[in-house]
């Protein structure tokens, strides 16, 4: 599936994490990449974690909430985001399917092999 310099995402299977949430996961030594698909109306509860988080929206739009700054940001296809370590954040998918690449460093091993909230 992965060779130095390349990851063949087509060879990875979609895993349903919970209703309206599917993912494909790649884990390296210091980096985790998750290709997500979210259905319309999906919400991700507020969370914070040790890992830095960045990402890129491939399709659709998300509403990113940063409660400690009292900010909401709409991000669409072609836009990205970066969330500092331990920064509270939440988001939702307003009205159409979203596909995005989430990237964590270090990897969030707690996400593997178990359902997310």
Residue ranges of predicted features:
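A short, N-terminal "cap"/entry segment at the start of jelly-roll beta-barrel domains
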Residues: 1-35, 112-117
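Conserved short histidine dyad/triad with adjacent acidic residue
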Residues: 17, 32-49
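A generic "binding-loop/recognition-motif" signal
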Residues: 31, 40, 50, 69, ...
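Short beta-strand segments in beta-sandwich/barrel cores
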Residues: 33-34, 43-45, 60-65, 80-81
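Short, conserved beta-strand element in jelly-roll/cupin
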Residues: 37-39, 49-64
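A generic structural motif
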Residues: 65-67, 92
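Short acidic-glycine-tyrosine-enriched beta hairpin
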Residues: 69-85
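Ligand-binding loop in jelly-roll beta-barrel domains
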Residues: 85-110
């Amino acid at each position: 599936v992965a060779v130095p310099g390349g990851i063949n995402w087509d060879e990875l299977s979609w895993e349903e994490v919970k209703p309206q949430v599917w993912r494909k996961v790649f884990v390296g030594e210091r980096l985790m990449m998750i290709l997500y698909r979210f259905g319309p109306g999906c919400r991700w509860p507020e969370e914070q974690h040790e890992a830095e988080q960045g990402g890129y929206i491939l399709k659709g739009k998300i509403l990113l909430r940063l409660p400690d700054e009292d900010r909401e940001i709409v991000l669409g296809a072609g836009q990205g985001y970066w969330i500092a370590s331990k920064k509270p954040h939440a988001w939702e998918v307003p009205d159409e399917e979203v596909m995005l690449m989430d990237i964590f460093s270090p990897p969030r091993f707690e996400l593997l092999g178990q359902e997310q909230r």
